[in-house]
């Protein structure tokens, strides 16, 4: 399954003209919840954005500038994005709606010039999921527990949370209209395979 599926979708290169990969997608199909694989879909969307970023001529220059502060590792993590996501989902028991909200948050911080790359994509994903989880569900886990699950220290988690909230200007609210737009995009591969 490909994210693009022969559709003309905008480039997800993170720059001042960043456009969400959701922006041009629309569908009238209904979601078949029994056939969902939200973890794989979520990871594929992030990997698609990452692959689009790699096409940018400024990609390696932006990696070397280390402009993303606490989001950026000094070395590439030794765990794949999908394995890291699977670990988070295993211990946090997250609803698919939370992953959709996390995707909205990732778009918001990318619009604020966070350039997704191999050095920051794990942390951007982690903090976006955690903030969506905190906002969307009855959060029973604290930063200490999430630090244990994520492999980061509690102070790193607090720093990520502060940076994240600053970047999105504390805009955690997601309207129903925006949520539905992202939900349709999120399940596009599943819907395409059912047709």
Residue ranges and their predicted role:
Residues 144-187:
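Channel- or pocket-lining gating/hinge segments that regulate access to a cavity or pore
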């Amino acid at each position: 399954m490909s994210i693009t599926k022969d559709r003309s979708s905008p480039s997800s290169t993170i720059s001042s003209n960043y456009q969400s990969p959701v922006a041009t997608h629309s569908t009238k199909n209904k979601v078949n919840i029994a056939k969902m694989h939200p973890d794989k879909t979520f990871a594929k969307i992030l990997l698609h954005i990452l692959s689009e970023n790699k096409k940018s001529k400024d990609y390696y220059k932006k990696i070397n500038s280390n402009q993303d502060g606490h989001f950026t590792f000094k070395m590439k993590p030794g765990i794949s994005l999908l394995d890291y996501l699977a670990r988070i989902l295993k211990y946090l028991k997250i609803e698919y709606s939370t992953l959709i909200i996390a995707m909205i948050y990732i778009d918001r911080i990318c619009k604020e010039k966070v350039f997704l790359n191999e050095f920051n994509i794990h942390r951007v994903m982690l903090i976006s999921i955690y903030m969506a989880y905190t906002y969307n569900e009855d959060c029973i886990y604290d930063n200490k527990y999430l630090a244990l699950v994520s492999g980061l220290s509690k102070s790193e988690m607090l720093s990520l949370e502060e940076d994240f909230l600053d970047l999105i200007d504390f805009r955690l609210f997601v309207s129903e209209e925006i949520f539905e737009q992202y939900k349709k995009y999120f399940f596009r591969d599943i819907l395409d395979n059912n047709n």
